Amino acid sequence: MSAKIGVITFPGTLDDVDAARAARIAGAEVISLWHADEDLKGVDAVVVPGGFSYGDYLRTGAISALAPVMQSVIEQAGKGMPVLGICNGFQILTEARLLPGALTRNKGLHFHCVDAHLVVENNTTAWTNTLEKGQQILIPAKHGEGRFQADAETIAQLEGEGRVVFRYTDNFNGSVNDIAGITNETGRIVGLMPHPEHAVEKLTGPSIDGLELFLSAVGTIAA
């Protein structure tokens, strides 16, 4: 039986179609989830994709974190369901308190659209276990509010527990400690600002490195 991966759509979501395609290429059955859904339809994992949900009003991700679908995601994540937050999805996961820290305006206050080189720091999560620790991957990034920040105690905890998953080699947005992605205590929830779903096919991406995150999830579900 194929892994069932749910992909959420909020008003203002942009990258749900690409995330769904990436999951399908990885061999998953994709289930579309609407922001007003309370029923997760039996999915094994959830992707919270990028975009500008609710127009980024109040704060990026703040309104989406209160949506009915996210209340169900929070409940199931507490039971171990793998969750991936990409860009705006990462922002939503921090607002929902599924991940610590906050994503704030980039240094220089500019929107950046670049192909980002990342170093894999943790390859034991549900979304990175087909990668190698220390491996460099290339996936696109596009955001104006992707500067990861947290208090010193939280940063020390993330570093000490090995919960930094990805680091930028060229820290264009000013994130603390070059952090591009993190995980929770269990390694089942991962958030990152760059877009792995845009790097799954040679025709359209700078690489196919992003596909590994979806393959990892499919393998985790099957295990």
UniProtKB/Swiss-Prot annotation:
What assembly does the database describe for this protein?
Answer: Part of the FGAM synthase complex composed of 1 PurL, 1 PurQ and 2 PurS subunits.
- Biological process per Gene Ontology, one example term: 'de novo' IMP biosynthetic process
Q: Which InterPro entries match?
A: Class_I_gatase-like (IPR029062), PRibForGlyAmidine_synth_PurQ (IPR010075)
**Known EC number(s)?**
6.3.5.3, 3.5.1.2
* Alphabetical list of Gene3D superfamilies matching this protein: 3.40.50.880
Name the catalytic site residues. C87 (nucleophile), H195, E197
Pathways involved: Purine metabolism; IMP biosynthesis via de novo pathway; 5-amino-1-(5-phospho-D-ribosyl)imidazole from N(2)-formyl-N(1)-(5-phospho-D-ribosyl)glycinamide: step 1/2
What do the Gene Ontology cellular component annotations say?
cytoplasm
User: Per its record, what are the GO molecular function terms?
Assistant: ATP binding; glutaminase activity; phosphoribosylformylglycinamidine synthase activity
Q: What is this protein called?
A: Phosphoribosylformylglycinamidine synthase subunit PurQ
The protein's location, in the record's own words, is: Cytoplasm
- Known function: Part of the phosphoribosylformylglycinamidine synthase complex involved in the purines biosynthetic pathway. Catalyzes the ATP-dependent conversion of formylglycinamide ribonucleotide (FGAR) and glutamine to yield formylglycinamidine ribonucleotide (FGAM) and glutamate. The FGAM synthase complex is composed of three subunits. PurQ produces an ammonia molecule by converting glutamine to glutamate. PurL transfers the ammonia molecule to FGAR to form FGAM in an ATP-dependent manner.
Which UniProt keywords are listed? ATP-binding, Cytoplasm, Glutamine amidotransferase, Hydrolase, Ligase, Nucleotide-binding, Purine biosynthesis
Q: Could you tell me the superkingdom of the organism this chain comes from?
A: Bacteria
Output the SUPFAM superfamilies linked to this UniProt entry: Class I glutamine amidotransferase-like
Q: Does the keyword Oxidoreductase apply?
A: no
Enzymatic reactions: N(2)-formyl-N(1)-(5-phospho-beta-D-ribosyl)glycinamide + L-glutamine + ATP + H2O = 2-formamido-N(1)-(5-O-phospho-beta-D-ribosyl)acetamidine + L-glutamate + ADP + phosphate + H(+); L-glutamine + H2O = L-glutamate + NH4(+)
- Say if the entry is tagged with keyword Cell division: no
What region holds the Glutamine amidotransferase type-1 domain?
Answer: 4-223
